[in-house]
Regions:
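A gly/proline- and charged-residue-enriched helix-loop-helix capping module
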Residues: 89-91, 233, 330
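Short, solvent-exposed amphipathic alpha-helical segments in soluble enzyme
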Residues: 58-63, 98-100, 131-134, 166-168, ...
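Glycine-rich phosphate/diphosphate-binding loops that line cofactor/substrate pockets in enzymes
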Residues: 28-41, 97-112, 231-243, 299-304
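C-terminal helical/tail subdomains of lipid-metabolizing enzymes
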Residues: 363-389
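Active-site phosphate/pyrophosphate-binding segments
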Residues: 139-309, 314-318
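Glycine-rich phosphate-binding loops that contact phosphosugars or nucleotide phosphates
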Residues: 34-219
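Extended, charge-enriched "interface" segments that sit outside catalytic cores
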Residues: 1-37, 325-330, 334
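Helicase-primase coupling helices
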Residues: 284-370
Length: 389
């Protein structure tokens, strides 16, 4: 991102008066949460890279795919949330503007939008272009809106463009901390603003990260999951030529976790240096079971140049049972009365066993269930793993 900064992500799981994440920060986030529940109908989160990917993971885990179709009561008062700024796509943005316009027409003059614009420099092309188009569209349609800016607040003498805009227009502001790259920023206000606006358990998320941080300080490699992962992947790359990593959680709620990991791995290992040879792996985002019908044949029968990283959730919230409604068809009989999430995990196990039986490198991380605590564990483990590697 320009000049080198210290790497301070290891401080992020802890709330302290003199830390990066403070009690005062949490208080402001909870005030934002309570305000939005009573005053905001729709949030549009505008950002790219680390200013988008971690927030999207939080949204997907907390809200799921159909959040914006629920009633206000079903959302417990929390606003709808859409994302923009992660690309410069006029068709996508026009569709979003039309959606906001329709919602405003349906509710009337009480309808209100919150634009959350996140940019460290305040001049990143994609989010700022999207933001300016969205703001003008809301103004032209007389739709009530307010702006929250998340940007670098560290330099009072040379404020970012976005911070200057926020001061001039009296917008609420939150901070992108010094020493925390975008790939780690989900554990800061960058991710927490989104978290607060949809009712995600921020303190549970940090507790999971802190639990994993403690494990990652263990000197015994077999008690340190991040160090073990880093060592195995390094050996796989340098000794066995496994220079591609397929990151493959099973379940739609974790689809965006793959995209987040692609950035984390790429920006952490893809470094130019005058003191060492180039190193890294090419990350490939995948999701099960969908990509079992797209990528997996190549994983199982293609070149021996990949490691596959699975993420498994043991118990899902809604293990819907397949009804035994077409049992006269022999090939469908086995599905009757089986939980659909059981099918998901059986598919993962079968994929893993097929790879292992052919000496194709893979590893599986299993969590008991998917919640804020275990998500914090998963994400912080991978932060430490790329650091160790």
């Amino acid at each position: 991102d320009g000049l080198p900064e210290p790497v301070l992500f290891y401080q992020l799981p802890y709330i302290s008066e003199d830390g990066i994440n403070t009690p005062a920060m949490l208080k402001r986030l909870y005030e934002l949460r309570d305000y939005a529940r009573h005053n905001i109908d729709t949030v549009v989160s505008v950002g790219i890279g680390g200013s988008y990917l971690g927030s999207k993971v939080i949204f997907d885990v907390q809200c799921g795919a159909f959040w914006n179709n629920l009633s206000t009561e079903e959302r417990n008062g929390y606003p709808r949330m859409y994302f923009a700024g992660f690309n410069v796509d006029g068709d996508y943005l026009a569709g979003l503007i039309r959606t906001l316009e329709y919602q405003a027409q349906t509710k009337g003059s009480d309808y209100k939008v919150m634009l959350v614009i996140t940019s460290k420099s305040g001049s990143t092309i994609e989010p700022m272009a999207n933001f300016m188009i969205l703001e003008k569209a809301l103004q032209d349609r007389n739709i009530n809106y307010e702006v929250v800016a998340v940007t670098d607040m560290s330099d009072d003498e040379h404020p970012t463009v976005l911070r200057s805009m926020a001061i001039e227009n009296h917008w609420k502001t939150y901070s992108i901390p010094y020493g925390v790259g975008g790939r780690f920023s989900v554990f800061t206000e960058v991710g927490f603003v989104t978290a607060a606006l949809v009712g995600f358990d921020i303190e549970g998320f940090l507790a999971g990260a802190a639990s994993m941080d403690a494990a990652c300080q263990e000197e015994d490699i077999f008690k340190n999951p991040a160090l073990l992962s880093a060592l195995l992947k390094y050996i796989a790359s340098e000794r066995y030529g496994r220079i591609i990593e397929v990151f493959m959680p099973y379940g739609e709620a974790l689809h965006s976790l793959s995209d987040w990991y692609v950035q984390l791995l790429s920006e952490s290992l893809g470094k130019m240096s005058n003191t060492c040879l180039p190193y890294g792996r090419t990350p490939v985002a995948a999701v099960g079971t969908m990509d079992m019908h797209a990528q997996v044949q190549e994983h199982q029968e293609g070149r021996l140049n990949k490691v596959v990283q699975f993420i498994k959730v043991k118990d899902w919230k809604h293990n819907l049972v397949v009804p035994n409604t077409h049992s006269k068809y022999e090939r469908l009989q086995a599905l009757g009365n089986v939980g659909i999430c059981d099918i998901l995990n059986i598919a993962l196990d079968a994929n893993r066993e097929a790879l292992s039986s052919d000496n194709r490198f893979n590893m599986t991380i299993t969590v008991p269930t998917l919640n804020s605590f275990h998500l914090g564990e998963i994400m912080f483990m991978h932060c430490w793993a790329v650091y160790f590697e």
